Amino acid sequence: MSRNQQLFDRAQQTIPGGVNSPVRAFRSVGGTPRFITRAEGAYMWDADGQRYIDYIGSWGPMIVGHAHPDVVRAVQETATQSFSFGAPTEAEIDMAEEICKLVPSIEQVRLVSSGTEATMSALRLARGFTGRDLIIKFEGCYHGHADSLLVKAGSGLLTFADTTQNAPSSAGVPADVTRHTMVLEYNNVTQLEEAFARHKGEIAAVIVEPVAGNMNLVRASEAFLTAMRNLCSEHGSVLIFDEVMTGFRVALGGAQAHYGIKPDMTCLGKVIGGGMPAAAFGGRRDIMAKLAPLGGVYQAGTLSGNPLAVAAGLTTLRLIQAPGFYDRLATQTRKLADGLTKAAREAGVPFCADAIGGMFGIYFTNEVPGSFAEVTKADVGRFNRFFHAMLAEGVYLAPSAFEAGFVSAKHDDAIIEATVAAAAKAFKAG
């Protein structure tokens, strides 16, 4: 029995499903999860000593690669001063100033510990600011596991849930909780216009992933985001970009910089923690002024602005500002997508890929999807076989057909070429 299997059997005795986040259990693809012991650069090693090229990157944070010496040094130095204070620090100010500098739509920012906290708090703040209750979200967009957002959500919920009904995607969420959440089709401008026409003066906020990364990778059209911006401005609703995944990943200023569209509020996570638990939400000063202790919208957190997380995140944010960083990252990610597409074509496999910044999506379909409905038409069985063939070749992809992949600054030409060569074998194997 492999060491991975031994650990999985042991884990299931004390941890539900043997994992602390559902997608890690390999339930979608089958087989035994890999228990990781260490990682460096673009590689990680499992409990059986197998090395993998890593295209998960901790689901996005590891943009500069695993165990970057500057990040490690910053965390080590901070740890000697204590792990947490429960009081303000100068480093928190440095972090806030860096975020506001890099994302101009954010005039003020509040640090939290997870993406779910960021989106949940942003929506509460939007409701408090507008005095309205109704929220619009989109099919397949995952905004964390707050009850009001678990309706036709992406990420692990897309893998496990029945998404055919406009009902909570998770057991334990009362329908009453989600009745103030309206779910529309991603990239459907007409639906969005109709929703605002029917609910004038009722919509507190629209929350969207400007590049969806939790139903695989699906880009928002420029027309869709522009209509969203215009409608929110016209009706006094708060436009929230959930950039937990895309922030500092699609571009230095996030997806909003890529599209040139300015939201009222932004949620950040993943990259801003450099691998540590950290997230943030921020935006217009007049909206943020409603947040406690200034205003009546409450939000708090014992470990918000944790010194170790801030040290890792701030160091990462400074590293990614190096000249040419994003040009190189986008080039490598595009090389990967194009190489995989070429290998599939040569093997006669229906397949396509897309890439934006340091994110990519692979689809066992003939065309890149533009909506939740199109994503669900992908050949999941074929993806599962491909996943295991790649794993056997030492390439670690997301263990679900409905998750985006991530490239780091450490994925050089040799690593991309090795990945494409492994894929060529996997495609030919069927």
From Swiss-Prot:
Cofactor(s) recorded in Swiss-Prot or TrEMBL: pyridoxal 5'-phosphate
EC number in record: 5.4.3.8
Any GO BP: protoporphyrinogen IX biosynthetic process
Enzyme class: isomerase
Sites of N6-(pyridoxal phosphate)lysine modification: K270
Gene3D superfamilies: Aspartate Aminotransferase, domain 1, Type I PLP-dependent aspartate aminotransferase-like (Major domain)
Catalyzed reaction equations: (S)-4-amino-5-oxopentanoate = 5-aminolevulinate
Keyword rRNA-binding attached: no
InterPro entries: 4pyrrol_synth_GluAld_NH2Trfase, Aminotrans_3, Aminotrans_3_PPA_site, PyrdxlP-dep_Trfase, PyrdxlP-dep_Trfase_major, PyrdxlP-dep_Trfase_small
Record flagged with keyword Cytoplasm: yes
Listed pathway(s): Porphyrin-containing compound metabolism; protoporphyrin-IX biosynthesis; 5-aminolevulinate from L-glutamyl-tRNA(Glu): step 2/2
Keyword entries, A-Z: Cytoplasm, Isomerase, Porphyrin biosynthesis, Pyridoxal phosphate
Coiled coil, from the record: none
Cell compartment(s), UniProt: Cytoplasm
GO cellular component terms attached to this protein's record: cytoplasm
SUPFAM superfamilies linked: PLP-dependent transferases (SSF53383)
GO molecular function: glutamate-1-semialdehyde 2,1-aminomutase activity; pyridoxal phosphate binding; transaminase activity
NCBIfam families according to UniProt: hemL, PRK00062.1
PANTHER family in the cross-refs: GLUTAMATE-1-SEMIALDEHYDE 2,1-AMINOMUTASE (PTHR43713), GLUTAMATE-1-SEMIALDEHYDE 2,1-AMINOMUTASE 1, CHLOROPLASTIC-RELATED (PTHR43713:SF3)
Subunit structure comment from the entry: Homodimer.
Record family assignment: Belongs to the class-III pyridoxal-phosphate-dependent aminotransferase family. HemL subfamily.
Name of the protein in question: Glutamate-1-semialdehyde 2,1-aminomutase
Organism (species): Cupriavidus metallidurans (strain ATCC 43123 / DSM 2839 / NBRC 102507 / CH34) (Ralstonia metallidurans)
Gene (name only): hemL
